[in-house]
């Protein structure tokens, strides 16, 4: 009986080994495992015959059966690894990727029209040697008003025009404080522009509580109003892509003397008169002037030795003129249908 069991064990091992070699896929290999090692498999059935063996033969035959199971399991495991590798290679071959094909483009946004205007302004002035400087949006009264020769009784310092904090600080109403801080830190001559957000208590079709402004400043021994006029004429020709007539009107600003407001020929009607320019043929775009001596004194610059000019204009206003936008609020409503046009 013992010899018969040994022959059966060897026969089953040979059958299993041959079947494993012939297996071509994982499903077939799994079926072989069930046929030989499963609950009703050939080796499991063979173990049931141990009851008919003598007490001396049982442990020997039982050990041989377990060795056979381990051997078959090892062959199946090795074959499984081989088949999985072949399966992966076949899948990769069927799903070949052409790495030379262009990738899929992600959906991208576009620059806001005000940002585009800011970049155009920065590009122009940086080519002329102007530094682009920035400063805090929360300011003190000194930098926002006093150093700019704006007295305490000036309307701009009233609560209804300026956003104040409880500690006396405020949201800057212009980017001029950046110029004051720069003049404190640098020695003339220098030239700079200061773009940024500013805040005022105002909201209608042409005004928002927050808007974008850029101011320019030049301090030198030979600064003249004529030089400023020439610069502005060249800037607007660059910005709008054509020569535009400019008109300087006398005005008043506490921080400049003399002061002027600058109008450009209406970009919609070429100066003929339309609704955009209220039929005047002109559009107001900025204020400017020669830096007031008191402003220079406040930052320890001798007004007898150095002179300067300054200007300030709204970037939102320029964006409206450049792109033909008739309502300022459209720039701040985050309407993607509108913004994607730019």
UniProtKB/Swiss-Prot annotation:
<dbReference type="GO" id="GO:0005737">
    <property type="term" value="C:cytoplasm"/>
</dbReference>
<dbReference type="InterPro" id="IPR006195">
    <property type="entry name" value="aa-tRNA-synth_II"/>
</dbReference>
<dbReference type="GO" id="GO:0000287">
    <property type="term" value="F:magnesium ion binding"/>
</dbReference>
<keyword id="KW-0067">ATP-binding</keyword>
<feature type="binding site">
    <location>
        <position position="257"/>
    </location>
    <ligand>
        <name>Mg(2+)</name>
    </ligand>
</feature>
<keyword id="KW-0963">Cytoplasm</keyword>
<comment type="subunit">
    <text>Tetramer of two alpha and two beta subunits.</text>
</comment>
<dbReference type="Pfam" id="PF02912">
    <property type="entry name" value="Phe_tRNA-synt_N"/>
</dbReference>
<dbReference type="GO" id="GO:0006432">
    <property type="term" value="P:phenylalanyl-tRNA aminoacylation"/>
</dbReference>
<dbReference type="InterPro" id="IPR002319">
    <property type="entry name" value="Phenylalanyl-tRNA_Synthase"/>
</dbReference>
<keyword id="KW-0436">Ligase</keyword>
<dbReference type="Pfam" id="PF01409">
    <property type="entry name" value="tRNA-synt_2d"/>
</dbReference>
<keyword id="KW-0479">Metal-binding</keyword>
<keyword id="KW-0030">Aminoacyl-tRNA synthetase</keyword>
<dbReference type="GO" id="GO:0000049">
    <property type="term" value="F:tRNA binding"/>
</dbReference>
<dbReference type="GO" id="GO:0004826">
    <property type="term" value="F:phenylalanine-tRNA ligase activity"/>
</dbReference>
<keyword id="KW-0547">Nucleotide-binding</keyword>
<protein>
    <recommendedName>
        <fullName>Phenylalanine--tRNA ligase alpha subunit</fullName>
        <ecNumber>6.1.1.20</ecNumber>
    </recommendedName>
</protein>
<dbReference type="InterPro" id="IPR010978">
    <property type="entry name" value="tRNA-bd_arm"/>
</dbReference>
<keyword id="KW-0648">Protein biosynthesis</keyword>
<dbReference type="InterPro" id="IPR045864">
    <property type="entry name" value="aa-tRNA-synth_II/BPL/LPL"/>
</dbReference>
<dbReference type="InterPro" id="IPR004188">
    <property type="entry name" value="Phe-tRNA_ligase_II_N"/>
</dbReference>
<comment type="similarity">
    <text>Belongs to the class-II aminoacyl-tRNA synthetase family. Phe-tRNA synthetase alpha subunit type 1 subfamily.</text>
</comment>
<dbReference type="InterPro" id="IPR022911">
    <property type="entry name" value="Phe_tRNA_ligase_alpha1_bac"/>
</dbReference>
<dbReference type="InterPro" id="IPR004529">
    <property type="entry name" value="Phe-tRNA-synth_IIc_asu"/>
</dbReference>
<keyword id="KW-0460">Magnesium</keyword>
<dbReference type="GO" id="GO:0005524">
    <property type="term" value="F:ATP binding"/>
</dbReference>
């Amino acid at each position: 009986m013992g010899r018969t069991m040994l022959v059966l064990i060897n026969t089953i091992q040979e059958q299993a080994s041959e079947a494993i070699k012939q297996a071509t896929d994982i499903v077939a290999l799994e079926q072989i495992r069930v046929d030989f090692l499963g609950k009703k498999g050939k080796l499991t059935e063979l173990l049931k015959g141990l009851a008919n063996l003598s007490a001396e033969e049982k442990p020997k035959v039982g050990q041989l059966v377990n060795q056979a199971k381990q051997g078959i399991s090892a062959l199946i495991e090795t074959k499984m690894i081989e088949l999985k590798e072949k399966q992966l290679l076949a899948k990769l071959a069927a799903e070949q990727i052409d790495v030379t094909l262009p990738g899929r483009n992600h959906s991208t946004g576009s620059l806001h029209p005000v940002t585009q205007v800011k970049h155009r302004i920065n590009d122009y002035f940086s080519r002329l040697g102007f530094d682009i400087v920035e400063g805090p949006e929360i300011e003190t009264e000194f930098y926002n008003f006093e150093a700019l020769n704006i007295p305490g009784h000036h309307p701009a310092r009233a609560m209804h025009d300026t956003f104040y904090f409880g500690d006396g600080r405020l949201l800057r109403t212009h980017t001029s404080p950046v110029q004051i801080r720069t003049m404190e830190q640098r020695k003339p001559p220098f030239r700079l522009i200061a773009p940024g957000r500013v805040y005022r208590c105002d909201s209608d079709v042409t005004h928002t509580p927050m808007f974008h402004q850029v101011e320019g400043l030049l301090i030198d021994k030979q600064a003249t109003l004529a030089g400023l006029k020439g610069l502005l004429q060249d800037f607007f020709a660059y910005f709008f892509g054509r020569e535009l007539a400019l008109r300087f009107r006398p005005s008043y600003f506490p921080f400049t003397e003399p002061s002027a407001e600058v109008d450009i020929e209406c970009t919609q009607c070429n100066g003929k008169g339309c609704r955009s320019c209220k039929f005047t043929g002109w559009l107001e775009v900025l204020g400017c002037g020669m830096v007031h001596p008191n402003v220079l004194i406040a930052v320890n610059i001798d007004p007898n030795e150095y002179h300067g000019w300054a200007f300030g204009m709204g970037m939102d206003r320029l964006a409206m003129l450049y792109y033909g936008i008739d309502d300022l609020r459209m720039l701040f409503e985050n309407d993607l249908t509108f913004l994607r046009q730019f």
